[in-house]
A protein has these predicted regions:
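Membrane-anchoring hydrophobic helices of lipid-metabolizing enzymes
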Residues: 1-97, 111-112
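Catalytic core of membrane glycerolipid acyltransferases/transacylases, capturing the structured
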Residues: 37-55, 94, 98-153
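Membrane-interfacial amphipathic helices and adjacent loop/beta segments
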Residues: 56-88, 120-163
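Residue-level preference for the first positions of well-ordered beta-strands
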Residues: 97-99, 172-178
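Short glycine-rich anion-binding loops that position phosphate/pyrophosphate groups of nucleotides
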Residues: 104-106, 154, 180-183, 213
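Short, glycine/acidic-rich beta->alpha junctions
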Residues: 105, 109, 157, 188-192
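Hydrophobic/aromatic ligand-binding patch that stacks against planar heteroaromatic rings
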Residues: 116, 140, 167, 198-199
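A cross-family acyltransferase "interaction/gating" segment
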Residues: 137-138, 174, 185-251
Length: 283
């Protein structure tokens, strides 16, 4: 099994695909056993590990990095393959701050994508404040110095993200955000706002788009965050080239949408076709 340092180095080489010794000899099929292994056995164990560290009061962003890699392993142990492609684009940014924007398909990218980003630099996330109220997970999230939004006042959320995000970026911490706001299996560019482009331009740091295919886990009912898992569905992340923050904001937004749309289409996922040119401007 790869150590976390070996994993990071492989990710920055440009291609990581789950090694054979990371996967079970007999992958589980979609059903209760896969659900149990992922949530009750895997996720619960990782959350418990994080809580123990938080209780001891010795929390650093390294914990966030370790837990993200642990969750990558949980997905693999359940039987799904995980791949990170194109992250060699981050090698030249290693140790430097940048902004990452990604589509929001499921809970999985919030847990696994940081594993790839941490390969290049420390990072934190923009998240809903309500997530900090989740048992266990909320305490871990709150300890990682996230930018928390109430999602009640769009103007205030924008101001908070730009102010707090710029301060963190100046401290050398990268920022990951999901401009869609809500999870959606079908990518609609009109709902992918330009907050990431605004933040990168304000702070003068590169903007990096990442496409995520994470339909391995789908929303459930009555508990949205504990839906069915299907190990036959690979988890994929594809990083685009770092974008110059001095480019016009419209061009930054367009480049991000084009990268994400192209990769999702390549993977057979749904993408809403833009009907009007101004759709790429975001909200």
């Amino acid at each position: 099994m790869l150590t976390i340092d070996e994993f990071h180095e492989t990710v920055l080489s440009g291609h990581y695909a789950s090694p054979a010794d990371h996967l079970p000899a007999r992958p589980l099929k979609k059903g209760f056993r896969a659900w149990w292994r992922f949530y009750a056995s895997g996720l619960a164990r990782v959350v418990a590990k994080g809580i123990r560290v938080v209780w001891k009061g010795n929390v650093t962003l390294k914990l966030f990095s370790e837990l993200a890699y642990d969750m990558t392993r949980v997905v693999e142990v359940t039987g799904a393959t995980v791949s990170f492609d194109g992250f060699d684009a981050l090698r030249k940014l290693k140790g430097k701050p940048f902004v990452v924007v990604a589509n929001h398909m499921s809970l999985i990218e919030t847990m696994l994508l940081p594993a790839g980003v941490f390969a290049a630099n420390d990072m934190t996330v923009v998240a809903k404040r309500s997530l900090t109220k989740y048992p266990g997970f909320g305490k871990i999230l709150a300890s990682c110095n996230p930018i928390l939004l109430d999602r009640k006042n769009a103007r205030k959320d924008l101001a908070d993200t730009l102010e707090q995000g710029t301060a963190l970026l100046k401290q050398g911490v990268s920022i990951l955000l999901f401009p869609q706001g809500h999870r959606a299996e079908v990518f609609d560019p009109r709902k992918f706002n330009s907050l990431g482009a605004k933040l990168a331009a304000r702070a003068g740091v590169p903007l990096v788009p990442v496409a995520c295919k994470t339909d391995f886990a789908r929303p459930g009912w009555p508990l949205k965050d504990f839906g069915p898992v299907d190990p036959s569905r690979p988890v994929r992340f594809a990083c685009g080239q770092a974008l110059d923050p001095t480019l016009p904001q419209r061009d930054l937004q367009k480049a991000c949408i084009e990268h994400i749309s192209a990769r999702l289409t390549e993977w057979g996922m749904g993408v809403v076709k833009e009907q009007e040119e101004n759709n790429v401007e975001g909200n």
